[in-house]
Amino acid sequence: MSSILPQHRIERVRYELIKRKVTVSKVERAGDGFARISFSGEDLAGFQSQSFDDHIKFIFTDARGQTVLRDYTPSHWDAEQGVLLLEFALHGGGAAASWAEQAAVGMTAMIGGPKGSMIIPAQQDWHLLLGDDSALPAIRRRLAELPAAARADVLLLRPAALAAWSVPRQAEWQLQQVTSQPPCWLPCASGRRRRAMALPGARARAG
């Protein structure tokens, strides 16, 4: 017999894989090196994204006329208004960063997916969120969706990148920087930090 309460069970949901044409409806940029781009369009009817860690294929044409596919987390889906928000990292000089740098209202692209959602209940007593810049959209979305009774610790390589955008503080959460010389990926750095942290005596979820 499972000891996991129903409200703490992870649920997996599958969706029909559909390609959709989307149009840029709004572009915002901030000092954290990200562009927040909103997309709309009739093809978004029926779109679903139930988990903060979902991913879609963003399909666009680069400067050479080549079709490029990149994975992105839906930062927010407003089903009522039919608006999908994606966040693009502008550093690194990649094709997607270049596209986002030039993004303007009226430009079009395609998205595919998500194939499904792994829904991690927000009713955990404590959440540990770890990531580098590529994880910021998922972390921001999770923090915004946590209930007021939740508590979270966030470990990042660049805490200022999270602070540059307003994140609703419905839940109680605190931000810490992971430092290492030379820099390494968070699974490496966070393991040492987690061993030094006083973990709360409650049902927790790390992500």
Map each language-model feature to its residues.
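OB/S1-fold single-stranded nucleic-acid-binding modules
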Residues: 1-7
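Ferredoxin-reductase
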Residues: 9, 14, 18-101
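FNR/FR-type flavoprotein reductase catalytic core
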Residues: 95-207
